[in-house]
């Protein structure tokens, strides 16, 4: 069997940015069209070439395909998002590191400081939101293309992945338990698979895009 090459730095950066957006805000009408577009289908096909990601991608593809059969899909996805990520009852999956006892308090602020980044004043959520971790990983993968800071950025990438993996599995389990339709449950499973893959829990080497 021919082994598929690992994801390129730029591909990681783009997929992290995409996932950050989906976990940060509700899917609007334009976002729903994009989810069902050929562009996203091509992206998922690219990810699916990696054996470690294939099952998670296939599940998400099924959930995206099912959106066309779901009446008022955009409104129902918005309701799913609100119920999972904005509520505080026991049937939610809050996307904040501080909600999980495994996470060291304030870790994301230290990571952002090391990266020379800060949270935009327009960002109204707490700084430990999942989307901030994913935006940081996106930035770090783009920065890995610059050879003069590759070693430092790669070390920071590993620290960010390790920090995220302290609580991401529990977040994913909460999505699985409480997302009755399953779109965000599938999305969280894909995210966890990608983070594990990036962290080297699967056979992975960072390569530059040709």
Swiss-Prot record:
InterPro entries noted in UniProt: Chaperone_TorD (IPR023069), DMSO/NO3_reduct_chaperone (IPR020945), HscB_C_sf (IPR036386), TorD-like_sf (IPR036411), TorD/DmsD_chaperones (IPR050289)
Gene3D superfamilies xref list: 1.20.120.1820, HscB, C-terminal domain (1.20.1280.20)
Signal peptide: none
Coiled coil, from the record: none
GO terms classed as biological process: protein complex oligomerization; protein folding
Location relative to the cell: Cytoplasm
GO CC terms, sorted: cytoplasm
Protein role: Involved in the biogenesis of TorA. Acts on TorA before the insertion of the molybdenum cofactor and, as a result, probably favors a conformation of the apoenzyme that is competent for acquiring the cofactor.
Family label: Belongs to the TorD/DmsD family. TorD subfamily.
NCBIfam families: PRK04976.1
Protein name: Chaperone protein TorD
Naturally occurring in which organism (per UniProt): Salmonella agona (strain SL483)
